[in-house]
């Protein structure tokens, strides 16, 4: 009996099938994920160190060694230049396509000046037409008064000055009324005595010179003479 033909297993790997064996080395790059690393060439100078280069470019010393295939005991001055691995952002891998799309999206979102003007005109028409049917208008004092947010700087300052002047006038009138009312209140609260009324009628009392005051003056003169 003839043995059935052997069929090769599906997905088998080996040298006969010509498929590449999967390796897990550090230098093998996966074809599924995009390359996110670019290399920067650095010219070595006499004062350069591996730690200084790692600190300068923001990478680790192991990354520099792996990129340049240096062992731990090797000196960096065996080569004239070193390649510094720098991680690139995923946005840089698309050659600026994402940035163009984002700019287009921002331009679509931003409204134009004409649209802004038309929308403001519609709002004004709605505000004037709503709430006043049959062509009835606003009262004159409401029509002339402008909203506070529409006032300019000069109008606001003029309004402030007028309020200050009005408050000053009111304070001055209040003080005048208070001064004119004080004597009336005093006369009503404190009745004048008959002696004060007599002084008010006769005027001030003249000073009289008595004999006692004369003798005192003479004694003072004698003391000064001595």
Curated annotation (Swiss-Prot):
Gene Ontology annotations for the cellular component aspect, listed alphabetically: nucleoplasm
Disordered as annotated region, ranges: 95-156, 170-226
Domain LysM: 40-84
PROSITE patterns attached to this UniProt entry: LYSM
Gene3D superfamilies the record matches: LysM domain
Superkingdom of the organism of origin: Eukaryota
Residue spans of biased composition, Polar residues class: 142-151
Database matches in Pfam families: LysM
InterPro entries registered for this protein in UniProt: LYSM1-4, LysM_dom, LysM_dom_sf
Ribonucleoprotein in keyword set: no
Protein name: LysM and putative peptidoglycan-binding domain-containing protein 1
Source organism: Mus musculus (Mouse)
Gene coding for it: Lysmd1
């Amino acid at each position: 009996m003839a043995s059935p033909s052997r069929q090769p297993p599906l997905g088998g790997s080996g040298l006969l099938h010509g498929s590449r064996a999967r390796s897990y080395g550090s230098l093998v790059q996966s074809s599924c994920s995009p390359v996110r690393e670019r290399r920067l060439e650095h010219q070595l100078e006499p004062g350069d160190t591996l730690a200084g280069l790692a600190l300068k470019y923001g990478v680790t010393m192991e990354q520099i060694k792996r990129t340049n295939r240096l062992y731990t005991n090797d000196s960096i001055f065996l080569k004239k230049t070193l390649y510094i691995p720098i991680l690139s952002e995923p946005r840089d891998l698309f050659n600026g396509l994402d940035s163009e799309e984002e700019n287009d999206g921002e331009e679509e979102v931003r409204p134009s000046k004409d649209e802004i003007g038309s929308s403001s005109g519609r709002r004004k028409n709605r505000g004037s037409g709503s709430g006043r049917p049959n062509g009835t208008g606003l009262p004159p004092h409401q029509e002339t008064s402008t909203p506070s947010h529409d006032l300019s700087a000069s109008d606001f300052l003029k309004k402030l000055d007028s309020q200050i002047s009005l408050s000053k006038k009111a304070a001055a009138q209040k003080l005048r009324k208070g001064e004119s009312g004080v004597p009336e209140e005093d006369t009503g609260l404190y009745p004048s005595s008959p002696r004060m009324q007599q002084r008010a009628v006769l005027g001030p009392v003249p000073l009289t010179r008595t004999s006692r005051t004369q003798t005192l003056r003479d004694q003072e003169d004698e003391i000064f003479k001595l």
